[in-house]
Amino acid sequence: NLGGEIRCDDTHTFSLSVNYNPWNFSGNKKMKHFLVQPEYRKWLNEAFTGSFIGLQVHYALYNFWGMLPWGFGNGKMLGIENRQIANNRYQGNLAGFGISYGYQWMISPQWNMEAGISLGYAHLNYKRYGQPAGAPLIEKSNCNYWGLTQIGISVVYFIQ
C-alpha cells in the first residue's frame, strides 16, 4: 500500500491511496486486488496534527478464490455464505464512498503515526466461477455493502 497527501490550506488536505496485492497463495488460493482511494480531509486543528474527518471514494478490481479476507471464518460476508466464498472464485469490481475519522501523532519533525477508520458503501459487480481453475462461469451478479470500509495504522513521512 502506498499513499500521498498534500496540504490544501491550514486545515484541509487531499490524499490518494493505492493498494495492490498480486499474489497467489498455496493451493492456487488468491486474494488479488487493486484499489484506488482518494480522500478529502478536514483537520479539526491544523493539518497533520490531531483529529480529522474525511470524505472518500473508492474503486477496486478483485479476484478472490479459496480464502476469506479479514478472518471471516463464520457467517456471511457481503451477504454471501462463507462456504461459497471458500469454494468459488469471485472476480469483479467495486465502487463506493465513505466517511472517515482519524488521528495523527507527531513522532518527530519528519515522522508521524496515524490511526483511522472509515464507514461507507460499496457496490460490487462480480462473476462467480466454480473450482478447479478454468471452471465455467456460474453466475454474474452484484451486491451492496454498508459498513466498515477501511481501518488502519500508518507511518507518515514528510517530504519537504
State where each predicted segment sits.
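Gram-negative (and chloroplast) outer-membrane scaffold detector with strong preference
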Residues: E5-A115, S154-Y157
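Solvent-exposed, glycine/polar-rich loop segments of beta-barrel outer-membrane systems
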Residues: N74-L78, G130-S141
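Residue-level preference for long, well-ordered alpha-helices that form the structural scaffold
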Residues: Y90, S141-N144
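Outer-membrane beta-barrel "beta-signal"
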Residues: Y145-Q160
